[in-house]
Amino acid sequence: MNYYFTKGKPQLVNMKTPIYLVTQFQQLMDLMQNQYEVSCLELMQRSGKAACDFLVYRWPKVKKISIFCGRGDNGGQGYVLAQQAKKMGMVPTVWQVGHQMSMSKPPQMHKEVWYEMNSCHQQGIVLHTYSPDIDLGDPELIVDALFGVGLYGHVRPEIALLLQRLQQFTVPILAIEVPTGINASTGEIAGNALAATATITFLCMKLGLLINDGKIYSGEIAFDDLLAPEAIYQQVKGIEESSLLDSSTFFSKKIWYRNKTQKGWQLSIN
């Protein structure tokens, strides 16, 4: 049972969002790029812009935001968010974790991430290299763009210390795709994890956000389908939620939806 709030009044509607494992999500991404010819850069830009849209919708008064970017695609989404935030009048501070600004593409960094990193630089957004002893200032909101679904194994000790440091802030935390330290398929903690106030996830709902520790650490969930065609969800079937999720999984869970037919966000409380 989903309730969507329109002008403060709940309306009962019937809407299902496909739930997927990470391996299935990767199949969807491959289809988007190879069959539907949506480039990796375009997907990164769509997701980063959607994340910024949700941030503004959810916390309209926030101005100073700190974005922690890893060197993978999740970091690229964070760089896109930073650019959008600046265009919308916010003051973004970008913290590069595990890498730094470079005029040539670093090894093991995807060209799309490097492109967005340089786009930030060209737009006058200062990129700071994170270190444990650096002053993080007083942000009004923190964006977790460190790993997303790209975390394999346990969180490294230096990242665990960063997560502990960020958790001490008393400001909202928005995670992009998946909170750092949460396994996107199992919902288990990979050694250490950052509890988010809200998580925005793309293309499909990840099972790990809804079960085990993931349903706690993800906070509210926002979902954007990145303009994916409906046919893609028939080509890669999601899991049957009834076979994997107990009846209490969605209880009091706030899930914000947006798809290609909507301009705004709708709130579902199951």
UniProtKB/Swiss-Prot annotation:
It comes from the Bacteria. Residues 25-234 form the YjeF N-terminal domain. Binds 1 potassium ion per subunit. Keywords: Isomerase, Metal-binding, NAD, NADP, Nucleotide-binding, Potassium. (6S)-NADPHX binds at residues 73-77, 148-154, 177. Its EC number is 5.1.99.6. It catalyses: (6R)-NADHX = (6S)-NADHX; (6R)-NADPHX = (6S)-NADPHX. K(+) binds at residues 74, 144, 180. One of its GO terms (molecular function) is nucleotide binding. This is NAD(P)H-hydrate epimerase. The lineage of its organism: Bacteria, Pseudomonadati, Pseudomonadota, Gammaproteobacteria, Legionellales.
